[in-house]
Amino acid sequence: MGNYFESPFRGKLLSEQVSNPNIRVGRYSYYSGYYHGHSFDDCARYLMPDRDDVDKLVIGSFCSIGSGAAFIMAGNQGHRAEWASTFPFHFMHEEPVFAGAVNGYQPAGDTLIGHDVWIGTEAMFMPGVRVGHGAIIGSRALVTGDVEPYAIVGGNPARTIRKRFSDGDIQNLLEMAWWDWPLADIEAAMPLLCTGDIPALYRHWKQRQATA
C-alpha cells in the first residue's frame, strides 16, 4: 500500500483529505503524516465510523498535526471499570451464552481541539478531551484531560510544563482571536504574527478595530 503523502516535509490540509462526516475541521489546519503513511481519517479511532450518532472530532483552524497523532473516539468502548468484569460481552453476538449481557457503552462527548494548536508526533488524545487555543502538545503525550489555552503539555499522562505567554498576553490573544480574521487582516498583521511581541500585535489589532 502506497504512502498517502509524497514528502515528510510537506503536510496536506485536513479539508483536502478528511472524508469522515464525524470529523469537522477549520481552515488551513494540516496533517503531516508521511512517517505513518495514512490520511488523517485514520487518526480518528472510531469503533463505528459510519454512524452519525457518535462523538464528533472538532479541530479548529491553523492547527499543525504531526505524523501518527491519534484521537480515541469510541467513548468507553463498552468497557466498564466499575463492573465486576470489563469484558464487552454485549458485543460478542456470535456467542449465545452472552445473550443476557448489558450494553456497557458510554459516549464521552465530542473531542474539541482549539485553533492554532500544535500537536507533536504520535500524541494520543483520550475521548472527550478539550484542548484550548494555542496549546502545544508534545510528541507521544497522552492527553487524558482538558488542556488550557496556550499551555505546553507533555508526558504520560500529559501534564502542563509551562504556559507559552504571560496571563495578560494570553488574555489578549484570546480576545483578538486572530484565527477568525479575514485573510486581508491576517496579511496586514503577518510581520507581527511571526514575532513574540504580543503587545505590539494587540496594539495593531486595536488600531485596525478603531478605523474599521
From Swiss-Prot:
Its EC number is 2.3.1.28. Pfam families: Hexapep. The keyword Acyltransferase applies. Homotrimer. The active site is at residue 79. Belongs to the transferase hexapeptide repeat family. One of its GO terms (biological process) is response to antibiotic. InterPro entries: Hexapep, Trans_hexapeptide_repeat, Trimer_LpxA-like_sf. CDD domains: LbH_XAT. The gene is cat. It comes from the Bacteria. Keywords: Acyltransferase, Antibiotic resistance, Repeat, Transferase. Gene3D superfamilies: Hexapeptide repeat proteins. This is Chloramphenicol acetyltransferase. The lineage of its organism: Bacteria, Pseudomonadati, Pseudomonadota, Gammaproteobacteria, Pseudomonadales. One of its GO terms (molecular function) is chloramphenicol O-acetyltransferase activity. It comes from Pseudomonas aeruginosa (strain ATCC 15692 / DSM 22644 / CIP 104116 / JCM 14847 / LMG 12228 / 1C / PRS 101 / PAO1). It is an enzyme of class 2 (transferase).
